[in-house]
Amino acid sequence: MATSRQLREQIAAGRWDAALAALYGGSEEVLSRQRSRYGAALEQFELYYGPGRQVQVYSAPGRTELGGNHTDHQHGYGLAGAVTLDLVAVASRNEDGFIRVKSRGFNKLDVIDLTEAEPQQGESTHSASLIRGIAEGFRAKGCDVGGFDAYTASDVLRGSGLSSSAAFEMGVAMILNTEYGCGLDAPALARICQFAENTYFGKPSGLLDQLTSAVGGVLFADFADPAAPKIEKIHADGVLPDGMTLCVTDTRASHSELTGEFAAIRNEMEAVAACLGGKVLGEVDEKRFWQELPRLREQCGDRAVLRAIHYFEENARTLAQRDALAAGDFAAFARLVEKSGHSSFECCQNVYCASSPKHQGLSAALAISQSILAGTGGAWRMQGGGFAGTIQAFVPDALVKRYCAAMEALFGPGCCYLLSLREQGAVRVM
């Protein structure tokens, strides 16, 4: 194991270029940026924790949701891809029983006393709660984990729908798993992270975000048994055909304060399920749902029923998307992407907040996307939890410049990201 200074010198000399190229691509422009980024993270670690420490460096990717919008928490199907935007963490084990994490862009140093295992008052919805919950998740699996000091630098947009929280969680989980020799596999780490987010952070999320960050590539998951989801990895290479670019636009309205809106989707879907004798919609007979619509409208309300309709139709669509990708039929996949986007808007109703109709950044971005991409073979949809954050578009290369210019005219310079899918999940890089 090398010290932070030794790693900085090795990175500058190009000794880690192969490892960086495997994650981000091998162009000199990309490598130069990542050398600088990793070097800066190591330097910041030294600033906060002192020089001479032996360290390891980890990477955990963000993800773009390709299908299955709000289906995973109902024990349905999910489809997502890891992206090249990631969180980098520099970490060193300590023996004092504390976890300390300083994250770029945040003033506070998170300090977690591991003798305090229970959720702490006032800590929910803060990163400290995730760290504490992840450590306790390891202990619940019989892992004897302890303290570490870490600095993180994330390029995953916070509150954007690219799952910055899952990248952060997986970074912390990778540190504990590696530094303390736990040997847990990627799905087990993902479940620990979901436990922390649900129980300690207080967000009722599904598992797809964490699984995609953990496993990498394009991931199809069947959550019929959420404790042991069936996972099928589709290799990232070849998913996008030549001449097609994945663009993600940040509408620059964070959804980080929208936990209540997200919870309402899950609660309303589960209210419909309860009326049909299930806990979640994945346990409900779809034919019976359609037969009992009048009663369900009266008992649960129209929005809950529409959200249940979205679940059933989106679930079938996600399965068809997987099959299209496996067959190399991007045209069929793109048509399904469009239908998914329309269902999120019309049925799931998570494109804007009904309580704030003046603010509809996602709606505007989708409307402009449709005006540019309709009939071109491209596709567009909102992604992630919704209400704010990002939209996703598959843009023919000939239209990328025009498309990005249109998005930047609405949301400002640098809002439109040209992304690549990433084969690797969360890893120790060096």
What residue ranges belong to the model's regions?
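Glycine/serine-rich anion-binding loops at beta->alpha junctions
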Residues: 59-75, 155-172, 376-394
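A short glycine/serine-rich beta->alpha loop
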Residues: 53-54, 70-77, 116-124, 154-162, ...
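Phosphate-handling active-site elements
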Residues: 140-148, 176-192, 397-410
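Fold-level recognition of mixed alpha/beta catalytic cores in primary-metabolism enzymes, strongest
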Residues: 160-248, 430
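Structural signature of FAD isoalloxazine-binding scaffolds in flavoprotein oxidoreductases
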Residues: 76-96, 215
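Beta-strand segments within the central parallel beta-sheet cores of soluble alpha/beta enzyme folds
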Residues: 100-102, 147-154, 184-195, 334-339, ...
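Glycine- and acidic-rich phosphate- and metal-coordinating loops
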Residues: 135-157
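C-terminal nucleotide
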Residues: 1-63, 88, 92-124, 220-381, ...
